[in-house]
Amino acid sequence: MRCALLAAVSLPFVFTALPLHAADLSDLTWTTTDDQVTITACDRGAAGELVIPDTIEGNAVTSIGNRAFRGCDSLPSITIPEGVTSIGDIAFQSCTGLTSITIPDSVTSIGDGAFSRCTNLTTIEIGVGNVNYTVVDGVLFNTKMTLLHTYPEGKTGANYTIPDSVTSIGALAFWFCRKLTSITIPEGVTSIGDRAFEVCKGLRSITIPEGVTSIGDFSFGQCTSLTRITIPGSVTTIGDSAFSRCTGLTSITIPDSVTRIGKSAFAVCRNLTSITIPDSVTSIGRYAFQSCEGLTAVTFLGDARKAGGGIFKYATSTIYRKPEAKGWRSTWGGRPVKLISEKP
């Protein structure tokens, strides 16, 4: 079934349903289960200030599904009705015309990246009675402010300090926030979600605090201005593509707490010249250093490990090892192996 949002509504922030007929619902697709409606899609040609009805065919609208409004780039505002409890993953992704959105009191769950790539979204607003989420300076948090959910991509300012109460940075939280050059992460943060800072191309340096144990997949991928990053001794896992295409990085220190380096973790870090792999690392994923064209020296402080396929593809590295280390042959991962004493 398909249904349309009301266009050009002259009553902002009205959450009650306006009279609708089937002919007015041609832009939306929805499903109905147990008398509850989930909006699943919207025609990308829909334009104007749109109001989602609170009922469709006599059934309450309670959910906005994953990707429901993805790519609807001609909607400057969308009114979500009271009664909606769930907003799905990337539900409003790439709504590039959207400048503000208000989340009603009834919402209890907001999916990852729900407002990602909304390039003109400067603030997120929330109903004063919502007990699950709060907004501070336009940034979306859970009520206890332990989770930073979304930093709007269109928000102005080059510097941002994450509040001290935050312990988790959500997946896609700062995705594509290219205006930011500096982000301060407080000491209490223990979790950084997948793609949390991906494509923050203005970000120049960042310190990951002690207590973080895992750096999520793609979490700092394509941060092309990043020249310095500090990884603490609490980190055990560097996720897949965690620092891929960080072309500004020239060096990085991996602490001896790390046991796993994910696939493509440092791929296309073209200006990375050297790296030291501690003895603690037992697993290195395929393509981990692919296309690191400037990487001339990789020093291993322990025994030889199983190399993932293509680990040094398009790289010209030389491997250096300790003389007492075991399992090494004349080549590893397709690159020559020498003793550390032979290092230039």
Would you name each region that the model predicts?
Residues 1-6, 95, 103, 107, ...:
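Charged, compositionally biased non-catalytic regions
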Residues 312, 327-334:
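Short loop/helix-cap segments at secondary-structure boundaries that form the rim of catalytic
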Residues 13-15, 141, 176, 218, ...:
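Aromatic (phenylalanine/tyrosine) cluster motif
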Residues 4-17:
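Bacterial N-terminal signal peptides
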Residues 27-36, 45-63, 73-86, 95-109, ...:
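Structural signature of tandem-repeat unit edges
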Residues 18-22:
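Sec/Tat signal peptide C-region and signal peptidase I cleavage site
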